[in-house]
Curated annotation (Swiss-Prot):
Gene Ontology MF term list: ATP binding; non-membrane spanning protein tyrosine kinase activity; protein serine/threonine phosphatase activity; protein tyrosine kinase activity; SH2 domain binding
Lipid-acceptor residues (N-myristoyl glycine): 2
One of the GO biological process terms: T cell differentiation
PTM-bearing positions, type Phosphotyrosine: 192, 394, 505
Tissue specificity of this protein: Expressed specifically in lymphoid cells.
Subcellular location: Cell membrane; Cytoplasm, Cytosol
Lipid attachment, kind S-palmitoyl cysteine: 3, 5
Domain annotation SH3: ranges: 61-121
Name of the protein this chain belongs to: Proto-oncogene tyrosine-protein kinase LCK
Family: Belongs to the protein kinase superfamily. Tyr protein kinase family.
Keywords recorded for this protein, A-Z: ATP-binding, Cell membrane, Cytoplasm, Isopeptide bond, Kinase, Lipoprotein, Membrane, Myristate, Nucleotide-binding, Palmitate, Phosphoprotein, Proto-oncogene, SH2 domain, SH3 domain, Transferase, Tyrosine-protein kinase, Ubl conjugation
EC number(s) per entry: 2.7.10.2
């Protein structure tokens, strides 16, 4: 037993349990429960929480308490539904589904990790974005739904315990831009952007700059808008029965088969790739799919589940805007500025740098195999599938389906696919991006492309392609694979292509 010394007790009740002689706080009996007797004679069992060891919890808000950022409707046996703003206690934190108990209903079940945030932290604030890079802050703020003055506060990438403010603004020359301000720490725990005015906390800082710009580029209008996150896939559902899938809309046909928008178990929107019968060995596919599902990154299309009997189905996350090559030709795609186009290239190269780090080769990198979300986020699809195809029209270089125009010379001539042949393909993909989906080597047949490459020919610089970007393409097309850059290098160049010569943060106002 122990005392949880507090400054005072409420004086409208009297207890019929032992109290501490020093502070008169109730001492928890051995059964961990106490009976409180109110002056009106009613009795209630007090849910005093027992704790291990001799010391009480340091904070009244325990670390395992979370608040729901969004409402969630249960859709599996064992998951727990909740309303936005509801408090839950996390019982087990493992993987993407956490076991929790609702403090409202007392019920227990599994909850999606990305629908909740720690209650005793900044995470529930709509303007706070945890683990967000400067570049991703720009992408979020420039996405549809945000306007002039939209803002967010994020953790500093370089200094632990520090923060940055990112604000959407309008520039006469550049159009919609995002400006960044360092939020500096005071020795006493406060914060400031300008030394002229300091704040005890970030909430006070946000309130001040919401009322007036006071030296910032603009007044803060509203927190950055984000969509409800996609719930994680239920972990036990990998090889699924075909009847659990309902194919709704045929989105297109590719080298491997048809792609459909559909629903899994009537409630989860997914993309379903139906592979042509005989196009690959089911056993080889399942072995590769088991490897592919371990490759999880925000720039890779997430593989959810498979149907392993022919025709093979691959179930992945659904991307609303379809393939990049098609999206670039739409009215929305045609309007994209060179800045946004290069940002798409930077997103793709980020995913390829991840595959490079994992020693994984794509083998078929082109705009047709990049998918685009409704917020213009780009993700790489079909990584690894190309080597499983058993169709001679695809595997032989003379075949009608072989993607000659995207393939490195050593892969065309000798079948040598490496991460460096992927780098060559990425150079071709960049031409697709800056030309809004134009087929590479316009006017040339596949045999003509092969002959010209053997003579050292390279595509000329496309119209509206920055000179520095074309130099990067030419590096990707170097004859010797080892002379081509790494994806990690390409990522570092493309992420800051237009900001390398500018200050990344605004001066103090």
């Amino acid at each position: 037993m122990g005392c949880g010394c507090s400054s005072h007790l409420e004086d409208d009740w009297m207890e019929n349990i032992d109290v501490c002689e020093n502070c008169h706080y109730p001492i928890v009996p051995l059964d961990g429960k106490a009976t409180l007797l109110f002056r009106n004679g009613s009795e209630v069992r007090d849910p005093l929480v027992r704790y291990e060891g001799s010391n009480p919890p340091a904070s009244p808000l325990q670390d395992n308490l979370v608040i729901a950022l969004h409402s969630y409707e249960p859709s599996h046996d064992g998951d727990l539904g909740f309303e936005k703003g509801e408090h839950l206690r996390i019982l087990e934190q493992n993987g993407e589904w956490w076991k929790a108990q609702s403090l409202t209903t007392g019920q227990e079940g599994f909850v999606p990790f990305n629908f909740v945030a720690k209650a005793n932290s900044l995470e529930p604030e709509p303007w706070f974005f945890k683990n967000l890079s400067r570049k991703d802050a720009e992408r979020q703020l420039l996405a549809p739904g945000n306007t002039h003055g939209s803002f967010l506060i994020r953790e500093s990438e370089s200094t632990a315990g520090s923060f940055s403010l990112s604000v959407r603004d309008f520039d006469q020359n550049q159009g919609e831009v995002v400006k960044h301000y360092k939020i500096r720490n005071l020795d006493n725990g406060g914060f400031y952007i300008s030394p002229r005015i300091t704040f005890s906390g970030l909430h006070e800082l946000v309130r001040h700059y919401t009322n007036a710009s006071d030296g910032l580029c603009t007044r803060l209008s509203r927190p950055c808008q984000t969509q409800k996150p996609q719930k994680p896939w239920w972990e036990d559902e990998w090889e699924v029965p075909r009847e659990t899938l309902k194919l709704v809309e045929r989105l297109g046909a590719g080298q491997f088969g048809e792609v459909w928008m559909g629903y899994y178990n009537e409630h989860t929107k997914v993309a379903v790739k139906s592979l042509k019968q005989g196009s690959m060995s089911p056993d080889a596919f399942l072995a590769e799919a088991n490897l592919m599902k371990q490759l999880q990154h925000k720039r890779l299309v997430r593989l959810y589940a498979v149907v392993t009997e022919e025709p093979i189905y691959i179930i992945t996350e659904y991307m609303e805007n379809g393939s990049l090559v098609d999206f670039l030709k739409t009215p929305s795609g045609i309007k994209l500025t060179i800045n946004k186009l290069l940002d798409m290239a930077a997103q793709i190269v980020e995913g390829m740098a991840f595959l490079e780090e994992r020693n994984y080769i794509h083998r078929d990198l082109r705009a047709a195999n990049i998918l685009v979300s409704d917020t213009l986020s780009c993700k790489i699809a079909d990584f690894g599938l190309a080597r499983l195809i058993e169709d001679n029209e695809y595997t032989a270089r003379e075949g009608a389906k072989f993607p000659i125009k995207w393939t490195a010379p050593e892969a065309i001539n000798y079948g040598t696919f490496t991460i460096k042949s992927d780098v060559w393909s990425f150079g071709i993909l960049m031409t697709e991006i800056v030309t809004h989906g134009r087929i590479p080597y316009p006017g040339m047949t596949n045999p003509e492309v092969i002959q010209n490459l053997e003579r050292g020919y390279r595509m000329p610089r496309p119209d509206n392609c920055p000179e520095e970007l074309y130099k990067l393409m030419m590096q990707c097309w170097r004859e010797r694979p080892d002379d081509r850059p790494t994806f990690d290098y390409l990522r570092s160049v493309l992420e800051d292509f237009f900001t390398a010569t500018e200050g990344q943060y605004q001066p103090q106002p």
